Amino acid sequence: MVEWANITWIMLHTFTVKIKENIIITHNNEIKDFLYLVINNLPCSICRNKSKKYFNDNIKTIIDKKTLILFLYNFHNFVNLILSKKQFDYHLLDRYYLTKTEEIFSIFNKLNQYPDEIKDFLIDNIIWFND
């Protein structure tokens, strides 16, 4: 897998499992906007275009932490299906509870060429996450 893809998945799964429950409720639209921004800037055009449709078709399912985690898990497997890759096992999500959020976000920001808006969101909202 391409380097940007690995760290992007790590960042996104860390994001979903480490975010505080109350943040999803109080900042639901901001979280959805952030996820859309990441998807809209995926370097892989095939992934980006199909992902935007998936996002638009399924984004309303995110109402709490559980549904956010499930949305991203299903989205990851949707992308893997497009790329003819092995499905991502749900139990692998457990490892993201052990990550250090700020460290993952920092690595993501250094390794990617995403717009500053994405990087700034992660830095500015680090207090939204448990560690």
What feature does the model see in each segment?
Residues 1-131:
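Aromatic-rich, lipid-facing transmembrane alpha helices and their immediate juxtamembrane interface loops
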